[in-house]
């Protein structure tokens, strides 16, 4: 594999926004209706349009206080403001929205600071009803302190097409059993993993029957009481509990055959592994976790330990992994991440037959990440001093149904005040029939990249309003095909794409730690 480089100091110019705008009425499940304005000429020409907008709640949790650090997190505010560690977002964040038949399911935490309950909403597109279940569990907070918000503690969500069960994994950040002398001070003994699931058919019940009673209580020896819906393992066997320790970032996927897969990160930022498991709908139980790569890589012969920042995805019938590496070597050029790495499995469940981007067999579980490295974004900045290159955020990847492979990443100088400061956004892509990657800096950057059909999309917010850019798979020829220009302004959101539609789950801009959530369904104009 070779890299074809197309560097450019000039970012691509976005397509001029359309000349004509028209107000579109928006469907809402609330008493008051909302209106959004989008470019009508742009939307009509590309077949991309806002299908509906629905308010899900008026009060979801958001962190509105000060960002704390390792020197200040033990002294959070005792007032109404909600201080936090890492980021402000916890609702409409992570793997929080999934369509199923004529329903859309969404997870969130209840606002404000004193509430924090795990919540599950179901929007019935036929009746227009949003029905919400409140769970007893409340957001744990950073290292078990509920006064410090923790943005990593997202709520992963899935619905099984095979039996209509609902699955949620939530509110954890590498928690383990420890004692008073440990990092978590014994706060997570027999409570370090949180899994909730429903009885079969719960996803399909009438609106008035969608209640907490459809979920299965924990009656095991580690149950925390009669209203405990949290299970310590996904296998139903407490002897497996060590397999469910120290995990973060739950994410579910569904195969074309309706099988559910799930993965999480085991370990920490610079010493971690991706673990995945599968749901057996007939037995109504999940398998134990299987590693994609080994943690503690030095003990397996590698020169250093490393962690993963990216995603495992199930696309086109294959389990795939794309990530950037965070090395435990703190004296190299990279302050945080480096590299672009990719692998896929030809086994339907990912249990072997793993290959690099060129189709060559790799070691499984992986130890030496260089076996699957594609290129080094840090090479686009020539700084050589330790920790001088900053790569955080702006990384994602996808594969079209034609097998066009795309990666995006962002790199800059760590010191923003240095005289030779550099900042570069990169798009690397390989069309399905091409042997080599094209790597271009003629790219304005993005946080995520998506696919539907043979097209790729960048979807996000501009001035608080959703926009969509589209390009043909295997190219860098993006154009703006949708831009909302008025209506509710949003702070952030998370996106799930399925059957040619983007389910954009959004938090409204506002003040305080209890803010509204909305669901926009955007038709991407993809034939299906």
Swiss-Prot record:
Binding, Ca(2+) 1: 218, 228, 230
Statement: the UniProt record of this protein carries the keyword Glycoprotein: no
Keyword Kinase among UniProt keywords: no
EC code: 4.2.2.-
Record field: pH dependence: Optimum pH is 8.
Entry GO CC: plasma membrane
Keywords: Calcium, Cell membrane, Lipoprotein, Lyase, Membrane, Metal-binding, Palmitate, Signal
A GO term, aspect molecular function: lyase activity
Signal peptide: 1-29
Catalytic residue list: 152 (proton donor/acceptor)
Residues where Ca(2+) 2 binds: 329, 332, 334
Swiss-Prot/TrEMBL site (Neutralizes the sugar carboxylate group at subsite +1) positions: 265
Membrane-topology annotation of the record: Lipid-anchor
Annotated compartments: Cell membrane
Main location: membrane
S-diacylglycerol cysteine lipid modification positions: 30
Binding residues for substrate: 151-152, 309, 326, 390
Family membership: Belongs to the polysaccharide lyase 24 family.
Function noted in UniProt: Ulvan lyase involved in ulvan degradation. Ulvan is the main polysaccharide component of the Ulvales (green seaweed) cell wall. It is composed of disaccharide building blocks comprising 3-sulfated rhamnose (Rha3S) linked to D-glucuronic acid (GlcA), L-iduronic acid (IduA), or D-xylose (Xyl). Ulvan lyase catalyzes preferentially the endolytic cleavage of the glycosidic bond between Rha3S and the uronic acid GlcA, but not IduA, producing oligosaccharides that have unsaturated 4-deoxy-L-threo-hex-4-enopyranosiduronic acid (deltaUA) at the non-reducing end.
Name this protein carries in UniProt: Ulvan lyase, short isoform
Source species of the chain: Pseudoalteromonas sp. (strain PLSV)
């Amino acid at each position: 594999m070779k890299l074809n480089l197309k560097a450019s100091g000039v970012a691509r110019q976005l397509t001029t926004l359309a000349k004509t705008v028209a107000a579109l009425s928006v469907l809402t499940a609330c008493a008051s209706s909302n209106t959004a304005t989008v470019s009508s000429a742009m939307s009509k020409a590309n077949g991309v349009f806002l299908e509906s907008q629905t308010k899900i709640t008026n009060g979801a949790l958001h962190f509105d206080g000060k960002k704390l650090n390792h020197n200040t997190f033990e002294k959070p505010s005792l007032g109404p403001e909600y201080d936090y560690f890492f980021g402000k977002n916890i609702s409409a964040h992570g793997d929080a929205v999934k369509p199923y038949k004529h329903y859309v399911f969404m997870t969130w935490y209840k606002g404000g600071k004193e509430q924090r309950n795990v919540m599950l909403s179901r929007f019935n597109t036929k009746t227009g009803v949003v029905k919400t279940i409140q769970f007893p569990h409340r957001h744990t907070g950073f290292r078990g302190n509920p006064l410090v918000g923790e943005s990593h503690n997202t709520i992963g969500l899935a619905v099984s097409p095979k039996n209509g069960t609902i699955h949620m994994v939530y509110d954890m950040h590498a928690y383990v059993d420890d004692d008073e002398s440990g990092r978590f001070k014994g706060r997570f003994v027999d409570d370090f993993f949180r899994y909730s699931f429903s009885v079969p058919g719960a996803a399909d019940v009438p609106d008035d029957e969608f209640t907490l009673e459809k979920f299965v209580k924990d009656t095991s020896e580690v149950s925390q009481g009669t209203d405990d819906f949290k299970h310590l393992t996904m296998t139903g066997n407490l002897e497996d509990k060590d397999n469910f320790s120290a995990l973060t970032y739950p994410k579910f996927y569904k195969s074309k055959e309706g099988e559910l897969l799930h993965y999480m990160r085991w370990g920490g930022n610079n010493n971690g592994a991706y673990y995945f498991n599968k749901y057996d709908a007939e037995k109504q139980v999940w398998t134990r976790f299987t590693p994609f790569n080994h943690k503690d890589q030095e003990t397996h012969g590698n020169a250093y330990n490393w962690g993963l920042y990216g995603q495992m995805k199930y696309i086109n019938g294959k389990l795939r992994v794309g990530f950037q590496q965070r090395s435990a070597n703190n004296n190299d050029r990279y302050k945080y991440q480096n590299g672009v790495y990719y692998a896929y499995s030809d086994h339907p469940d990912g249990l072997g037959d793993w290959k690099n981007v060129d189709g060559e067999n790799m070691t499984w579980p992986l130890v030496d990440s260089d076996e699957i490295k594609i290129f080094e974004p840090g090479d686009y900045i020539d700084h050589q001093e330790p920790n001088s290159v900053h790569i955080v955020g702006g990384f994602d990847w996808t594969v079209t149904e034609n097998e066009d492979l795309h990666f995006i990443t962002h790199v800059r100088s760590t010191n923003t005040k240095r005289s030779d400061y550099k900042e570069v956004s990169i798009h690397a892509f390989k069309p399905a029939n091409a042997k080599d990657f094209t790597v271009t800096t003629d790219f304005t950057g993005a946080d995520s990249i998506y696919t539907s059909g043979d097209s790729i999309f960048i979807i996000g917010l501009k001035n608080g309003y959703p926009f969509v850019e589209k390009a043909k798979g295997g190219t860098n020829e993006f154009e703006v095909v949708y831009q909302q220009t008025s209506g509710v302004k949003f702070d952030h959101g998370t996106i799930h794409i399925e059957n040619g539609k983007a389910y954009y789950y959004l938090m409204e801009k506002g003040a305080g730690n209890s803010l509204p959530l909305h669901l926009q369904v955007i038709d991407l104009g993809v034939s299906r």
